[in-house]
Swiss-Prot record:
NCBIfam families: glgX_debranch, PRK03705.1. Its EC number is 3.2.1.196. It comes from the Bacteria. This is Glycogen debranching enzyme. The gene is glgX. GO terms for biological process: glycogen catabolic process. It comes from Salmonella gallinarum (strain 287/91 / NCTC 13346). One of its GO terms (molecular function) is hydrolase activity, hydrolyzing O-glycosyl compounds.
Length: 658
């Protein structure tokens, strides 16, 4: 290897061209940048990056090849109040690193200093960036591009989904390989989902607090390297990228999209007492929102907040997203705490990152789903994201639970949420698919726990049950816990069926939490972010097969109803929907607001959803015509009904006109 040539300012990161590697690093406030490369024995050699174009430092190392381990030492002022925390004693990860060797351990050498710099060198324990070649044969891969109106999302954790699956080869359980295995692909197809939404797969770290407690960050919302796949779910770290792409390719062949949950709102550097391993040491002032006293704005609850209005950070975020689309062929993203994306620092629909995504021909055409809040002032922004974003609809989640479990909710409020929350999303040219309807997600109770627990039980998380929400809108049906007498178990089953039908037969984009179709329980833990164990892993051998069949039949039924798949707003008289009372008459104003929870929803003039959310068996008069119950509500003896359905308590049935 020779001294660095000046190289080029683009592309960003470390790029192998067959003869050497071009290195770039963005830092608006650095005074000097050293590239540090390591041999197999850990010996370090340093090179100054000789080029600078604007705020991008660059250099070219001839003869360097994939597999080279490297990092940066960045020189500049230590002025904490001004937000500058440069410390060349700390080896730093490339923010664009495609692979990382080593974990982020709770080690004193990884701290850069609080009021004063920590000048102890950390190279011996710091994680290191690794140069890769990302060549891959995609063969004839093509994105499914499922229309929003036909999309059914399945939210899952890479490890937890398959780790206990008995039909998968032992060595691939809980890995990227398992996602594309024929056993899993066949299951997804049988269930009927069209998109697999994965909890974070970018490399993440366990917070020092968890490490000291003997726990790990299981969910992955603590990002360490946004361009690198988490290596623990691959057969070996160097195979992670190809194994993930193999899975994407297999899923695409089956017509299933892959959506990534991505964390652009904060980094694993946490607060000022957290480790300095990348952005803080590269350009703290540019990458993070800094308060007047030099500390961080903590709008994420994780200690820091990325400044996604800074031009350099906007470019970083967009290149990260494009990398996953162009190099890994993913079909979209779910953005964690997405209100941070629109902060300037107040939330704006024309914020720089939103504008950049909208203008990008790659990113503007994939599925974009916002978790439309953060914990800062003005952070709750449900309904306010610009096209082409869809959003998680917590109004739907809470209304569905309150309607069935049972809570005080009017028929009018339920109908509004059933109709894609038009009062929230029917603006700026958005379609009903912008409302991502959910009953549950990774964060909160599972569906089974919603009918078995009134209180959270998070003691295993080590925070004395203080963590996790207290607003669960759940109902244990008279007994806290999973067991109980037969009549109680039947009530719970009926509530689960009614909730699933509400989710999968409502207008908008449904999202199903993996395991809800099995009856998976986390034993009342509604914040299992640090539980990498049997509490969160899906137990396929104990799965409720009847519930899985019921769920699959609901999804098939959904795809047959034009009013649900058309992705256009329902208008009075358009034949898409009619709202009827228990006597098959239009609901009166009083019934909308004060009536019992009895109603009928006629979709596409031939599919009738009859609802009895009361505690009593009630006769419901069907509209004129011959009606027959449809799967999964049809039994072996499925007579034509022409007059009255005897609706059981907490009951729901779907009929099709003969």
């Amino acid at each position: 290897m020779t001294q660095l040539a000046i190289g080029e300012a683009t592309p960003h990161g470390a790029t192998y061209d067959g003869h050497g590697v071009n290195f770039t690093l963005f830092s608006a406030h650095a005074e000097r940048v050293e590239l540090c490369v390591f041999d197999s024995r850990g010996n370090e050699r340093r090179y100054d990056l000789p080029g600078r174009r604007g705020d991008v430092w660059h250099g070219y190392l001839a003869g360097a090849r994939p597999g080279l381990r490297y990092g940066y030492r960045v020189h500049g002022p230590w002025q904490p109040v001004q937000g500058h925390r440069f410390n060349p004693a700390k080896l730093l990860l490339d923010p664009y690193a495609r692979r990382v060797e080593g974990e982020l351990k709770d080690h004193p050498l990884l701290h850069g200093g609080h009021d004063e710099p920590d000048y102890r060198d950390n190279a011996a324990v710091a994680p290191k960036s690794v140069v890769i070649s990302d060549h891959y044969d995609w063969e004839d891969d093509a994105a499914p591009r499922t229309p929003w109106g036909k999309t059914v999302i399945y939210e899952a954790h890479v490890k937890g989904l398959t780790y206990l699956h008995p039909e998968l080869p032992q060595e691939i359980r809980g890995t990227y390989k398992a996602l594309g295995h024929p056993v899993m692909v066949a299951y997804f197809k049988q269930l009927g989902i069209t998109a697999l939404e994965l909890l974070p797969v970018a490399q993440f770290a366990s917070e020092p607090r968890l490490q000291r407690m003997g726990l790990t960050n299981y969910w992955g919302y603590n990002p360490m390297a946004m361009f690198a796949l988490h290596p623990a779910w691959a057969s070996s770290p160097e195979m992670a990228l190809d194994e993930f792409r193999d899975a994407v390719k297999a899923l695409h062949r089956a017509g299933i999209e892959v959506i990534l949950d991505i964390v652009l709102n904060h980094s694993a550097e946490l607060d000022l007492d957290g480790p300095t391993f990348s952005l803080r040491g590269i350009d703290n002032r540019s990458y993070y929102w800094i308060r007047d006293d030099g500390d961080y704005h903590n709008w994420t609850g994780c200690g820091n907040t990325l400044n996604l209005s800074h031009p350099g950070v906007v470019e970083y975020a967009c290149e990260c997203l494009r990398y996953w689309v162009e190099t890994c062929h993913v079909d979209g993203f779910r953005f964690d705490l997405a209100s941070v994306m629109g902060r300037t620092p107040t939330f704006r629909q024309d914020a720089p990152l939103f504008a950049a995504i909208k203008a990008c021909p790659v990113l503007s055409t994939v599925k974009l789903i916002a978790e439309p809040w953060d914990i800062g002032e003005g952070g709750y922004q449900v309904g306010n994201f610009p096209p082409p974003f869809a959003e998680w609809n917590d109004h739907f989640r809470d209304a569905a639970r309150r309607f069935w479990l049972p809570r005080n909710l009017t028929t009018g409020e339920f109908a509004c949420r059933f109709a894609a929350s038009s009062d929230v999303f029917k603006r700026n040219g958005r379609a009903p698919g912008a409302s991502v309807n959910l009953l549950t997600a990774h964060d909160g109770f599972t569906l089974r726990d919603c009918v078995c627990f009134n209180q959270k039980h998070n003691e295993a998380n080590g925070e004395e049950n203080r963590d996790g929400t207290n607003s669960n809108y759940s109902d244990n049906n008279g007994k806290e816990g999973l067991g109980g007498p037969l009549d109680l178990m039947e009530r719970r089953r009926d509530s689960i069926h009614a909730l699933l039908a509400t989710l999968l037969l409502s207008q908008g984009t449904p999202m199903l939490l993996a395991g809800d179709e099995h009856g998976h329980s986390q034993h009342g833990n509604n914040n299992a972010y640090c539980q990498d164990n049997a509490l969160t892993w899906l137990d396929w051998q104990q799965a409720n097969r009847g519930l899985t069949t019921f769920t699959a039949a609901l999804i098939r039924l959904r795809q047959q109803i034009p009013a649900l798949t058309g992705n256009s707003w329902w208008e009075e008289g358009d034949g898409n929907v009619r709202w009827l009372n228990k006597n098959a008459q239009p609901l009166s104003a009083d019934e909308w607001q004060n009536g019992p929870k009895l109603m009928q929803i006629l979709l596409s003039d031939r599919f009738l959803i009859a609802i009895n959310a009361t505690l009593e068996v009630t006769d419901i008069v069907l509209p004129e015509g011959e009606w027959r119950a449809v799967p999964p509500f049809a039994g072996e003896d499925n007579p034509v009904i022409t007059a009255v359905w005897q609706g059981p308590a907490h009951g729901l049935c779907v009929f099709q006109r003969g």
